[in-house]
Amino acid sequence: QAKHKIEKMILFQRPGHEVKLNAPKEVNWEEVVSAAKEIDCVEMNSNEFAYILYTSGTTGTPKGIVRDIGGHIVALKWTMKNIYNIDEGDIWWSASDIGWIVGHSYIVYAPLFKGCTTVLFEGKPVGTPDAGAFWKIISDYKVKSLFTAPTAFRAIKKEDPEGKFFSKYDLSKFESLFLAGERADPDTIKWAENLLKVPVIDHWWQTETSWAISSNCTGIEMTKTKYGSACKA
């Protein structure tokens, strides 16, 4: 049981689902934002801490991973061009959760370090409102590359195996799909390749590394890959 006790909680009130706040511990998001003041940037040493993020604990007790500032920035910016082939001004979408390492690295830090647009999406690949949700986002925002989990594409494949929703949208700006977070089964990869007609890349990394340590690099040179493996055959 944690000995540290939370002093304040900031709650975002969703329309139609408002809750009564327990003041003074619970405060309204809108009130906090409206009262916010601009804070100047603070100069830090490159070896100081950026954040602590805990691992999932799948194989044991969760471990607090400490990330430094300088090396983290250099590595993430390098990956955006060399692994994902993303340049300044491109539209990038990492369909993950900011609380996970993918969200930390590739919703927030990496795209902003690189100077590209990062898409934030709240919803599911199906049911919000249908199996065309991802295609609509890619089409509306002219997304160049998407990073998501294989489960998302398995869900889309199950709901729309023939890709009927896909045909409703213009994905002419879309160049690549990256999968990670779990095993990407060959059937799902092949289905996505046949539908999207772009490279579908299964790559591997973990919270401890903060970026991919096994991947095809679309910004350097694509190598032949065996289905079910992350990168080189």
Where are these regions (language model features)?
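Short beta-strand->loop structural element characteristic of the AMP-binding/adenylate-forming
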Residues: Q1, G64-V66, T117-V126, I201
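Conserved pre-ATP/AMP-binding loop-to-beta segment of ANL
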Residues: M9-L11, H17, N22-Y54, T61, ...
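Short Gly/Pro-enriched turn/cap motifs at secondary-structure boundaries
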Residues: C41-M44, K226-K232
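Conserved S/T- and glycine-rich ATP-binding loop of Class I adenylate-forming
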Residues: F49, T55-T58, M80, W92, ...
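Conserved AMP-binding/adenylation subdomain of ANL enzymes
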Residues: I73-I91, I101-S145, K158-K164
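Residue(s) in the substrate-gating loop at a strand-loop-helix junction
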Residues: D97
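Gly/Ser/Thr-rich phosphate-binding loop
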Residues: C116, K144-T148, K157-T225
